[in-house]
Swiss-Prot record:
It is a peripheral membrane protein. GO terms for biological process: protein insertion into mitochondrial inner membrane. Its main location: mitochondrion. GO terms for cellular component: cytosol; mitochondrial inner membrane; mitochondrial intermembrane space protein transporter complex; nucleus. It comes from Schizosaccharomyces pombe (strain 972 / ATCC 24843) (Fission yeast). This is Mitochondrial import inner membrane translocase subunit tim13. Disulfide bonds join 45-68, 49-64.
Amino acid sequence: MGIFGGNSGNAPSSEDKKSIFMKQIRQELAVAQAGELISKINENCFDKCIPEPGSTFDPNEKSCVSKCMERYMDAWNIVSRTYISRMQREQKNLN
């Protein structure tokens, strides 16, 4: 028995390796998607709401950016939920 109570001689099963690999892929995908979301929000909301950048935001610009970000986040969440739901259905159909 190993130091922490497990069998130190047992290598992870192929299912364990697959599970670990899939978890890593999901995490990397989530990070990439978050980066893409932030990039799109910056690109589109900034261009739309701040046509002439200055040293400070005026209240209208702040409000516009805030609303734009909320819309992007809402749309992103809807698309993500729909995609996940579809992937889960397809996974069930394969099994």
